[in-house]
Amino acid sequence: MIKIPRGTQDILPEDSKKWRYIENQLDELMTFYNYKEIRTPIFESTDLFARGVGDSTDVVQKEMYTFKDKGDRSITLRPEGTAAVVRSYIEHKMQGNPNQPIKLYYNGPMFRYERKQKGRYRQFNQFGVEAIGAENPSVDAEVLAMVMHIYQSFGLKHLKLVINSVGDMASRKEYNEALVKHFEPVIHEFCSDCQSRLHTNPMRILDCKVDRDKEAIKTAPRITDFLNEESKAYYEQVKAYLDDLGIPYIEDPNLVRGLDYYTHTAFELMMDNPNYDGAITTLCGGGRYNGLLELLDGPSETGIGFALSIERLLLALEEEGIELDIEENLDLFIVTMGDQADRYAVKLLNHLRHNGIKADKDYLQRKIKGQMKQADRLGAKFTIVIGDQELENNKIDVKNMTTGESETIELDALVEYFKK
């Protein structure tokens, strides 16, 4: 038997309705913030991610699904969404649009060759937003407010917003030099990844999952001590907006995101639920990127965005015992007796469905008792029984499956009955 590839999942009907509910709610929330949907290809040129995500990142070095197409071009299944959206922004010359900033959102599958663990898959669904074309602290604050709004709209309460500033390029350069000087004497004690990053991207050492508890990390210089006046002022304005909005946050000077393109504001949303031993799970992350467009041969525009995993959102809802308010039950199940009634039911179903009524019938020639059980399993709100007598008299009993009460109406009036 051929089985599903490792690190992937089948989303079966019982779960797909949850996905559809979440995606529909996210679509609606985006209209409140004036964000428009963008759809980019599932695969892109490998060079896009090598340049846009960063050669020194784990994503590029270890996790990408890359192959040669029949034209001998290097192609990669997208591991994240920002680089592709920025590529589209540049390619379609959106910088010429007077409605700056351009507010975009995306939703779709991403691919990373990761070790399978709870909430992580090699094909995962990512929802994200990008606001491109305005370097303004109020845009950063709006994006952070949106993050909180999204998770709170699903009823999640144990949320912890963690923020930091990674400064502008000048601040980062000075900070990186200080990190190299700090870690160089002890780098031999660190993992091979950290050793390779020392002179390429030393900030990523702070993000190492293997060596996070080493004393050298705890005593490492802090980026906040290397921010120039412009970066400090920008960060203070972002925090002031968050204070005005009443959004609580925690500052973590060691917070650096795993991708190379972040500048200024960086953030993560954590789930901190004491009901499961205080475990903290990263639900969402993002930040500002002020050099990414130029890195991809675009204009000197700036942007900010975030991405979240639908799988992790579902896991968080499960952890907090939150049931989604999903209404997908049938309006009506038709029970038939005899061939003539069954033929009529096919025609009636077509009429009902074209009038916006969710309806179904038996297809296995079950007895009446079996058909009623099927109606109950499907969660039908109402049932009707059609036989020769009902067809002859043009009258049916509509049974409410919740109360057990029935009402006799004319068969021709069934649509009107459900629309009243």
UniProtKB/Swiss-Prot annotation:
Q: Where in the cell is it found?
A: Cytoplasm
The primary location reported for this protein is cytoplasm
Q: Which cysteines are joined by disulfide bonds?
A: C191-C194
Q: What is its EC number?
A: 6.1.1.21
Query: PROSITE patterns from the entry?
Result: AA_TRNA_LIGASE_II
Annotated GO MF terms: ATP binding; catalytic activity, acting on a protein; histidine-tRNA ligase activity; transferase activity
Q: Which domain of life is it from?
A: Bacteria
Classification via InterPro entries: aa-tRNA-synth_II, aa-tRNA-synth_II/BPL/LPL, Anticodon-bd, Anticodon-bd_dom_sf, His-tRNA-ligase, HisRS-like_core, HisRS/HisZ
Report the enzyme's class at the first EC level: ligase
GO annotations under biological process?
A: histidyl-tRNA aminoacylation
Q: Name one GO cellular component term.
A: cytoplasm
Describe its assembly. Answer: Homodimer.
Q: Which family does it belong to?
A: Belongs to the class-II aminoacyl-tRNA synthetase family.
User: What protein name is recorded for this chain?
Assistant: Histidine--tRNA ligase
